[in-house]
Amino acid sequence: MISQFEIIGDNKIGVLPKQVDQLQMCRDIAASKDLQENDSSFMLVDLDKIIERFQLWKRELPMIEPFYAVKCNTDLVLIRILASLGCGFDCASKDEIDIVMGTGVSAERIIYANPCKTRSFIAHAMDRDVKMMTFDNPEELLKIAKLHPNAEMILRIAVSDPTATCPLNLKFGADPIIAAPQLLKTASEEGINVVGISFHVGSGCNDASAYRNALQHAKNLCEIGEGLGFKMDIIDMGGGFPGAEHHNPFEKIAETIRDALDEFFPDTNKRLIAEPGRFFAAGPFSLVANIIHATEVPASKITKDPKDCADHGYMYYINDGVYGSFNCILFDHAHPIGSPLFDTDRNEKFMSTIWGPTCDSLDLVEDKKLMPKMNVGEWLYYPDMGAYTLAAATTFNGFSKPVPMYVMSEEMWESIRDSTHV
């Protein structure tokens, strides 16, 4: 169990003598809450895993600087840990810039990676000396030139993987063949400083070859930009890196990127950056929700098949839902899979539905799920719940967000404790 408590920012951190076992730690916390008759949901945050993910990144892609996509999860402890490791930050708004700089991160470690920015936010970026920022259209280019003449502009191109969980090229990115060269010419004519090329293959990329195609376009555009007198020092590879077990593992994506860099940018002195979000945020966060109600129904009510009317089914209601942490189901196309937190000897499984706590029938967490019969007061465990969950959670209907509980091992604590960001 926890051997000591430390502080990161304003948050209490439980330090353990050995590596964190997320499932067992969740069981220990839930058992303690049961003794206190406390059924509130909670989010265990394993800070070791953030450091391990950073180490994995540096091992597989040592030539690329990670700039964490703050929109994915604005948890301040997560941000402080990444800052202490030397990570940069991808911000999309005034508030995100202030959140990051509030932890002591310098402006040089921030990219304002939103191609369509509010005018007052651009002025704020200038006030805070944040210079790197993206654009994908002439109107944005001229708007930034007027409001932030010292900005270092990075041209975002549309190269999204069409099979990605969340393709992004419908909203952002200039056509790399037609529009992008013209934007470089416009910037040159207006005397605006363009320093590189940016792309984003889509959140939850399924096709690693999308990175190769994007880097090929980036090489061509760098040559055009250099011909116009720009230095073109930066290649920003965006996000799309998986944060949990995935049919297209990170190591395979990293291999594709390394090969493409060798092909298109051999012996380069360019600054290579990327904007991973879920890669860092997903795995450290485990959600534990309490079953607040259970009711038996004909299985046909769940399967919508009249032939199942004689079978038993169960509908469970838990104290978190799509208006809370599970908003990822609606906004991130996620499919969280929960399981009983504690082992059970109830081997028979029944067709089940997991509902959130609100009065809205849209608040559906899992459907047509086979699981043992559960009772009110028991707990369900959902791993890998840190990406695009808490960042968009609400308190609709008066239901609270889960409380984060932070833990890490003594070894990892010693590795970061002296950082100015902690």
UniProtKB/Swiss-Prot annotation:
Result of knocking out the encoding gene: Deletion mutant pc13 has a reduced brood size and reduced enzymatic activity. Smaller body size as compared to wild-type. Reduced putrescine and spermidine levels. Double knockout with the polyamine transporter catp-5 results in a reduced brood size, delayed postembryonic development, and a more marked reduction in putrescine and spermidine levels as compared to the single mutants.
Lineage: Eukaryota, Metazoa, Ecdysozoa, Nematoda, Chromadorea
Protein name, entry field: Ornithine decarboxylase
CDD domains: PLPDE_III_ODC
Source superkingdom: Eukaryota
UniProt-listed InterPro entries: Ala_racemase/Decarboxylase_C, De-COase2_C, De-COase2_N, De-COase2_pyr-phos_BS, Orn/DAP/Arg_de-COase, Orn_de-COase, PLP-binding_barrel
Residues involved in substrate binding: 331-332, 360
Cofactor field: pyridoxal 5'-phosphate
The family this protein is said to belong to: Belongs to the Orn/Lys/Arg decarboxylase class-II family.
Active site: 359 (proton donor)
Modified-residue entries (N6-(pyridoxal phosphate)lysine), positions: 71
Quaternary structure (record): Homodimer. Only the dimer is catalytically active, as the active sites are constructed of residues from both monomers.
